[in-house]
């Protein structure tokens, strides 16, 4: 990955004076490949304020390179230059970890590797017993439907589409929220977001157009089991951070509460605050519930005539309690910055999920791993309980939503699964865990 970061301890030994590391992090077996990226001014303000209120800020590890890096596959990465066009954009510096940068260059020269771009898989094909996959059917760039035979099928199509492909292919029993039976589509979990924006005078230059996707400063004081939940009446937790990834001219427009939504006053406020504000977020954990699930839509279909995936979801009391608690704790950091104005963007009591505003793409569940085929779709190696030559890596395997973004653990779990495939399954195809 070329991850930039600062460890707190390595093999039980404190790294340096601990500055920049996360005191709540588990012990590491090795240092990060690269040192932490430089902090933006917004991150420096957050770090100073967090220290003042008694929290323990640390540099966010980021899959953006702080310097040149060559990974174990021989793939080369250049240093991130904080261009600000990171999230949602291809990196022209090769500074952002992704399969096309970190793995594909090593695969291309291999004689047994073929990449077929512009392909859309419609379903996994099963034999007459419905216990073995025979391949997949896909549509190519010319719109032709093609059947690709295969001895092994790996679904790595993002959380939503992994679940949809399993449902469309008849792999695993669909979840029924009324009876609680079935496994595919259950345990769908979101991410419980809260945001605070602090607005400053023109002499505080945060220059939000500068940024790197994963760079920032965070506190973990209220994440996971790092604090006593007892008095607060909820489970779960959240890191809080300033992650200045770059702010596009329109999407990044944000003005203090009370600013008119249009007209000359809005234009003036936009000019006054565009480069003089700090945005901080809590990316909170989210628990799965019986009534939050995924299934095939009975009405709406895609361009190929196949049912779309339907998401049935709403916030629950625990989610709102946790969210409001995080806003309160994060608000102390904002107040310590002494801004002109503060906007608190948290959930209200009784609030429902709103599909009109973007919140996060860090989704979990729907094809979860477990120890029992009656309650999970996959075993510990991400192998389907029902169709042994289908493996499904992705955040779809997580039964609950984490207090961190899932990407790092998705990658680790995928390597775990790939090793089991290579060292166990290919030598003796069949279930790797006996039900």
Task: Identify the function of each model-found stretch.
Residues 1-118, 359:
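Conserved redox-cofactor binding core of oxidoreductases
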Residues 5-26, 340-351, 427-435:
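Short, glycine/acidic-rich hinge or "gate" loops at secondary-structure transitions
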Residues 181-321, 360-364, 384-385, 392-399:
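FAD cofactor-binding and catalytic pocket of flavoenzymes
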Residues 6, 62, 68-72, 126, ...:
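Short, solvent-exposed loop/turn and secondary-structure capping segments
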Residues 82-86, 122-127, 275-286, 291, ...:
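A glycine-rich dinucleotide-binding beta-alpha-beta segment and adjacent secondary-structure elements
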Residues 1-8, 50-57, 107, 111, ...:
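A generic secondary-structure signal for well-formed alpha-helical elements
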Residues 110, 119, 123-211, 394, ...:
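Glycine-rich loop(s) and the adjacent beta-strand/alpha-helix scaffold that form part
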């Amino acid at each position: 990955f070329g991850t930039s970061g600062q460890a707190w301890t390595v093999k039980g030994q404190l790294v340096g004076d601990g500055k920049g590391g996360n005191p709540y992090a588990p012990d590491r077996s090795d240092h990060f490949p690269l040192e932490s990226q430089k902090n933006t001014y917004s991150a420096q303000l957050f770090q100073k304020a967090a220290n003042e209120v008694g929290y323990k800020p640390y540099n966010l590890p980021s899959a953006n390179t702080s310097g040149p890096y060559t990974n174990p596959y021989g793939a080369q990465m250049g240093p991130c230059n904080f261009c600000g066009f990171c999230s949602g954009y291809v990196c022209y510096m090769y500074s952002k970890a992704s399969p096309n940068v970190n793995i594909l260059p090593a695969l291309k020269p291999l004689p047994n590797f073929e990449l077929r771009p512009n392909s859309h898989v419609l379903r996994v094909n099963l034999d007459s017993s419905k216990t073995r996959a025979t391949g997949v059917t896909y549509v190519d760039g010319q719109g032709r439907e093609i059947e690709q035979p295969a001895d092994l099928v790996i679904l790595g199509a993002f959380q939503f589409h992994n679940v949809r492909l399993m449902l469309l292919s008849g792999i695993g029993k669909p979840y029924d929220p009324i009876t609680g039976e079935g496994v595919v589509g259950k345990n769908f979990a979101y991410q419980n977001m809260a945001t605070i924006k602090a607005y400053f005078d023109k002499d505080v230059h945060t220059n939000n157009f500068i940024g790197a996707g994963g760079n920032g400063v965070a506190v973990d004081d209220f994440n996971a089991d790092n604090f006593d939940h007892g008095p607060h009446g909820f489970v779960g937790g959240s890191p809080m951070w300033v992650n200045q990834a770059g702010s596009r001219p329109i999407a990044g427009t944000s003005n203090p509460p009370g600013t008119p939504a249009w007209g000359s006053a809005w234009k003036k406020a936009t000019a006054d605050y565009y480069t003089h504000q700090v945005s901080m977020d809590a990316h909170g954990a989210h628990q799965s519930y019986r009534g939050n699930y995924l299934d095939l839509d009975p009405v709406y279909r895609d361009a190929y005539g196949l049912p779309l995936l339907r998401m049935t979801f709403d916030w629950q009391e625990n989610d709102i309690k946790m969210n409001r608690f995080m806003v309160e704790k994060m608000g102390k950091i904002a107040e310590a910055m002494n801004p002109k104005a503060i906007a608190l963007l948290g959930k209200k009591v009784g609030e429902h999920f709103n599909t009109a505003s973007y919140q996060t793409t860090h989704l979990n569940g729907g094809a979860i791993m477990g120890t029992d085929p009656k309650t999970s779709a996959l075993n510990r190696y991400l192998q389907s309980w029902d169709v042994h030559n289908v493996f499904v890596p992705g955040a779809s395997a997580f039964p609950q939503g984490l207090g961190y973004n899932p990407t790092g653990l998705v990658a680790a779990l995928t390597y775990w699964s790939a090793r089991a495939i290579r060292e166990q399954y290919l030598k003796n195809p069949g279930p790797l865990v006996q039900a």
